[in-house]
Amino acid sequence: MGSPVHRVSLGDTWSRQMHPDIESERYMQSFDVERLTNILDGGAQNTALRRKVESIIHSYPEFSCKDNYFMTQNERYKAAMRRAFHIRLIARRLGWLEDGRELGYAYRALSGDVALNIHRVFVRALRSLGSEEQIAKWDPLCKNIQIIATYAQTELGHGTYLQGLETEATYDAATQEFVIHSPTLTATKWWPGDLGRSATHALVQAQLICSGARRGMHAFIVPIRSLQDHTPLPGIIIGDIGPKMDFDQTDNGFLQLNHVRVPRENMLSRFAQVLPDGTYVKLGTAQSNYLPMVVVRVELLSGEILPILQKACVIAMRYSVIRRQSRLRPSDPEAKVLDYQTQQQKLFPQLAISYAFHFLAVSLLEFFQHSYTAILNQDFSFLPELHALSTGMKAMMSEFCTQGAEMCRRACGGHGYSKLSGLPSLVTKLSASCTYEGENTVLYLQVARFLVKSYLQTQMSPGSTPQRSLSPSVAYLTAPDLARCPAQRAADFLCPELYTTAWAHVAVRLIKDSVQHLQTLTQSGADQHEAWNQTTVIHLQAAKVHCYYVTVKGFTEALEKLENEPAIQQVLKRLCDLHAIHGILTNSGDFLHDAFLSGAQVDMARTAYLDLLRLIRKDAILLTDAFDFTDQCLNSALGCYDGNVYERLFQWAQKSPTNTQENPAYEEYIRPLLQSWRSKL
C-alpha cells in the first residue's frame, strides 16, 4: 500500500496575513481603486448589489468550486446541476428576476460553472423569434423550470455555415404538423449544451419545406424527453458527445430526429409564418433568423469571454509580485519578476486590452439594446451594423483573450501549468470561444463583406443611387486621410488623435486594397464567388485591422467621459496608449507599407511604449484589484488576494485524491519491478 503524503500542520496563520510583497503594491495608491470598480460595474449601487449576491453565493457550501480540479466529468456535471438547482431556490426565495442583475452576478461568482446555461439561450431565442402568443405559452414554462430547453443548431457536418444545415422540417397540411427529420448522419445535431442528459425540449433550427419549396432556416420547438421519466421520446436518438478539452460540467449532446411531428404552432413565427394551408408568409428579412445569434454574441462578450482574460491578468499579476527570481543588481535581493521589463511586456498588453474590451462591450451593449427594440418592431435598419459589430468583436475578443490568457499562463512559469493555478482551465475555456457561436475566421469574413459594401457605398456618385448614411463604425472611410504620420518625437505617440488616425489610415488602405483586388479578378473574368475566395486572406487582414481600430476608438471615447475622474482617467489613458501602440508595433509592417510611418517613427513609438511599461508598473496590482474578483471566484492558488501563493499551493496539492488513496499500480507493477531487480542483485 502506498503511503499518503506526509501532512505538515500549517495551521491557518498564513491565511490571515497579507504577504508583504503584495501589501507593498497596495500601499501607495495613485487612484481610488474602489471608484474604478464602481465605474467598471456601471455605478456604486451595482458594485454593492454584486458583492451582496457574491456574499450570498459564497455562504452556501452547495456552491463551492474548490474541489473542481479533482473531479471526474460525471462529478463536475452533478456539481454544476446542484448549483443550478440551488440558484433557482435562492432566486425564488429572494425574488431575483430572470432578467435582473442578481442572476448575472451569481453566474459571475460561480465562474459560469453552473448547469442549464443553454436554457437561457433558448429563452433569448424564443423572445427574439417567437410571436407574443408563443412567448406567453413557453416563457413561463421555462421560467418555472417546468421544461428544460436547449438550442439545437450546430450539426455534425455543419456549424457556422447555417445555410448548409441539413435537418428538415416539412409541413404536412393534412395534419397541420411539421415533420422534423435528420436525413443524413451529418444532419445530427452536435454540440448543444444541456442536450446530452438534461433537456426536455429543443429549439431545433431546420430547413423549412412547405408547399414544395425550401424556405431556409427556421426555428421549431421540439419535445425530446418525457416529462414523466426523462426517457427519449419516439423518434429521438440522443446522448452525450463524449470528452472535451474543457466544460466537463456541460452535457454537450447529439440529437437525431426520425420523422418527429410537432404542431404548426411550434414554429417560431415573429418574422415568418406557415398558414394552415401551407402558404408561407414572410414578415421580416432573411437575416431575421440570425437575431438569436447576435443576442448570444453580445452577451458572451461581457458575460463569458472578457471576465476570463481579466481573471488571468489578476492571477498572473499577483503571482508576479510574489515570485522572486534572480537579481537586477548583484548586491540586490532577488527581484519580483514583475520588475523585469520582459514580464511587463508579457502582461501589461493583456491588462490594457482587457480594459479596452470592457469599454467596447459596454458601448456595444448600449447599441444592441437600442437596435434590438427597433428590430422587434420590424425596423431592420440597424441590423447590418449590429451584425458586423457583434461578429467582429466576438471574433477579436475571443482570439485576443485566448492568446492573452495563454500569455498569462506562460508568464507564471511552471506553476502556471498546474491546474491549481486556475490558468489552464481559463485558457481551455477561452479556446472554445474561438469556435462556438461562429468560427472566428468566418466571422471576420462576414465583417469584411460589410466593409466592402460600405467602401463601395462611399464610391458611388451622388446622383446614381440614393445613398444611405454610413454606419458610425465605418464613418472613418470618408474622413480626411493623412498620407504621412506627423509624429516628430516619442511623446507624440501618446496623443489619442494621432494613433486613432493612424489605425484609421491603415484600415482604409487595407479595405481599399481588398476591394481593388476583388474588382481586378472580376474584371479579368472571374465570377464573384471565385474572386471572393481568391481574396479572402486580404479581406481577413482588413477586417482584423478594422476591429482593432474600433477598440482603440472605443477606448478613447470612454476616456473622454471620465473628465471628472482625473486620476482614473490618467491611469486608464496609459493603458489606452499602450493598447494602441502595442498594436502598431506588432503590426508595424502595415504602417510602414505605404510609408505612413517611417522607420524612425516606429523607433519613437517603441520608446513611448517602453516608457509606458515603467509607468504602468506601479499601478499594475491596483488595476487588477479593480476587477474585484473574490478568491472563490478566481479559484486559484496563485491569484488569491493575500498573496500567500506557496502555502496555498502546497495545501491544495494535499487534497488530491492521489495523495489519500492507495497507489493503484503498486501491487501489480511497481512491487514486481522492484522485486525482480532485487532478485538479480
Curated annotation (Swiss-Prot):
Q: List the disulfide bonds.
A: none
| Keyword tags | Disease variant, FAD, Fatty acid metabolism, Flavoprotein, Lipid metabolism, Oxidoreductase, Peroxisome, Phosphoprotein
Sites where Phosphoserine occurs are at 3, 9
UniProt key word Lipid metabolism: yes
Tissue specificity remark: Present in all tissues tested: heart, brain, placenta, lung, liver, skeletal muscle, kidney and pancreas. Most abundant in heart, liver and kidney.
A GO biological process held by the record:
bile acid biosynthetic process
Mind telling me which Pfam families this protein's record contains?
ACOX, ACOX_C_alpha1, Acyl-CoA_ox_N
Please report which protein family the annotation says this sequence is part of: Belongs to the acyl-CoA oxidase family.
What name does this protein carry?
Answer: Peroxisomal acyl-coenzyme A oxidase 2
Please give the organism.
Homo sapiens (Human)
Mind giving the lineage of the organism this protein is from?
A: Eukaryota, Metazoa, Chordata, Craniata, Vertebrata
